[in-house]
Amino acid sequence: MTVSSLVALPSHVSGPRLAGMTGQSDEVQVHRRFRGPPTSGNGGYVAGLAAEWIEGPAQVSLLAPIPLEVPLHRRRDDAEVMLFDAQANYARAAPLDDPLNFEVPGPPTEDELEAAAMSFPGPSGHPIPGCFVCGTERGPGDGLCIFAGESPHRDVAVAEWIPEAELAGEDGHVEERYLWAALDCPSYFGLCEPRPLALLAQIAARIERPVTPGERLRITGWERSREGRKHHAATVIHDEAGEIVALSKALWVEIKELPA
């Protein structure tokens, strides 16, 4: 059965969440607002678009830079969701077998957050200053403004995030694609120095509960291991009570320069 077959949706509007069904398809676009590098979508945001049709924890592989402002097909066949067009397959999402049961650092303290904010690179030192999630050229109401700086006490990057009301869907909760986006960049800034230029190749996430706009969240990113050009990292989001809201693991791959 085909649901919403080739219906054009604005990038900020969710397609139908029918995770138990198969054979569904629609059309989405990644608006320029949701870019990572200058000419392609933010990896976490795009992963969230694909994962919306997966019930429960999901893993998303990013197969090619995701173009901006062009129609993309989103299709689910059995357990797999693909984002693609006539030129390429861009993302593949599937249910996650790994429960992500690894040890996570505790939430950052107020002092830690304050010190980390001071260490975050400014526009001249930022590798992708226009990024929707972490770009220093983006302001409130435009980007997520998650500036995960280095902790002075631990080998992690930490930041505070208070989601804005416009990130909410019809149910009043922050749309999960934005939680996926928030899980993206902090894991990069958690990579150990010297931190290479790298792009997200794969991300797996588990969302523990819905998030309400205005909640005060604390985000921690860290490197778990590295092998050659591959860096395995993770991100955890805690609420004010210290409970885990979302958790992810990510694969970053070093590159020499950003794609044109």
Model-derived segments and spans:
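Non-catalytic linker/capping segments at the edges of enzyme domains
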Residues: M1-E27, D78-D171
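Intrinsic-disorder/low-complexity, polar/charged segments enriched in Ser/Thr/Lys/Arg/Asp/Glu/Gln
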Residues: G23-E27, P57, R154-V158, Q202, ...
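Short hinge/gating elements
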Residues: R32-G36, L167-G169
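Hydrophobic beta-strand-centered segment that forms part of the acyl-chain substrate-binding groove
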Residues: F34-P38, V46-A79, W180, D184-I219, ...
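Residue-level detector of beta-strand face positions
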Residues: Q59, E80-F84, H232-V236
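A mid-sequence, solvent-exposed acidic-amphipathic segment
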Residues: D142-E208
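Accessory, usually C-terminal, subdomains that scaffold auxiliary metal cofactors
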Residues: A205-A260
